[in-house]
Amino acid sequence: MAQKKVNAVIHSQEKLAEGIYSMWLDAPEMAKAAAPGQFIAVYTNDQSKLLPRPISICEADKENGRLRIVYRIAGAGTKEFSAYKEGDTLDIMGPLGNGFPLKKKKAFLIGGGIGIPPMLELAKNLDCEKTAVIGYRDKDTFLADELRKYADVVIAT
């Protein structure tokens, strides 16, 4: 699929932890083409911010045509994203990047903080024994329960 910018509708948005948000976007073509480890470029609706924010794809729901991103507020652009509501729209481009190789060997997934979201789609797609070691700065262990559905999870804080 050639990457192109599309205007996606926000299906839902939820605060997972302090400064961490989960957003589902209606983007059927991108969801169908997405692979574990890829990302999308997310544009703000504020035209003074020219550059998109690269955000990893957390999940791709190919059946319903949706992408899930989980992001941390790190500046003005992601702070703007956190104020969006269901039904709002934003421009996205993707899927971008090469993604992760999916080999049928034992997998050891390691990630911390905002590096954890792309591990969820990878764990769902790997057809092998999986252990995920995930780290957090504090007690807010977002996505840990979701990862437990697909891998043995070890938490480091």
Residue locations for each model-derived region?
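Ferredoxin-reductase
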Residues: 2-86
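FNR/FR-type flavoprotein reductase catalytic core
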Residues: 76-157
